């Protein structure tokens, strides 16, 4: 099973299309850095909302 992942990585590393993706999407790096925080912000927003309505 581990060989499947290694073979997949080997195929993608030799493909010029996949090799250019990070460079092509370098403009969206700041957005990608913030994306993991979005679920935490959603949780905090729900908590603040419930606090605003007195936890009904």
UniProtKB/Swiss-Prot annotation:
Pfam families xref list: PsbK
Record flagged with keyword Mitochondrion: no
UniProt-listed InterPro entries: PSII_PsbK (IPR003687), PSII_PsbK_sf (IPR037270)
GO CC annotations on file: chloroplast thylakoid membrane; photosystem II reaction center
Positions of the propeptide removed during maturation: 1-19
Keywords: Chloroplast, Membrane, Photosynthesis, Photosystem II, Plastid, Reaction center, Thylakoid, Transmembrane, Transmembrane helix
Membrane topology qualifier: Single-pass membrane protein
Subcellular location(s) per record: Plastid, Chloroplast thylakoid membrane
Spans traversing the lipid bilayer: 35-55
GO terms, biological process: photosynthesis
Family in the record: Belongs to the PsbK family.
Role this protein plays: One of the components of the core complex of photosystem II (PSII). PSII is a light-driven water:plastoquinone oxidoreductase that uses light energy to abstract electrons from H(2)O, generating O(2) and a proton gradient subsequently used for ATP formation. It consists of a core antenna complex that captures photons, and an electron transfer chain that converts photonic excitation into a charge separation.
NCBIfam families: PRK02553.1
Subunit structure and binding partners: PSII is composed of 1 copy each of membrane proteins PsbA, PsbB, PsbC, PsbD, PsbE, PsbF, PsbH, PsbI, PsbJ, PsbK, PsbL, PsbM, PsbT, PsbX, PsbY, PsbZ, Psb30/Ycf12, at least 3 peripheral proteins of the oxygen-evolving complex and a large number of cofactors. It forms dimeric complexes.
Protein name per UniProt: Photosystem II reaction center protein K
Organism of this sequence: Pinus thunbergii (Japanese black pine)
Upper classification of the organism: Eukaryota, Viridiplantae, Streptophyta, Embryophyta, Tracheophyta
